[in-house]
């Protein structure tokens, strides 16, 4: 199985599930190794950035740890993107009538010709971050769930969260 962190470079491995701009929500099936169409977002909604997961991790909801990749172009489902964590949102989501921790992590791709990408969540434009927060809240509400954001954190805390979620 692909590790969460590249053994040579230490870069975070991210597998893309859903491309930026898509209304389709794709999910990876570990049993078959295939991606399947799991949801259609309501009219007028689309993923603001590509969404994926970190392999060899397990979040509190039983799935691999989710990440949103801050990158201008849509990325194809199934591709591996060497990435750097820039932070996350402390969040809780309703699941089976109970509120459970379900933080959101953010990454940027590591590219040789990078144009000075953000290194910390606070480097993002405040309006952009507000729009991303609104996306998560609205998306969950339209799926019949409640989503609450309780703060933000930087790359160090994000890396600790990933390390705690590594499958043993």
Each model region followed by its residue ranges:
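Hydrophobic N-terminal alpha-helices or hydrophobic patches in metabolic proteins across all domains
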Residues: 1-168
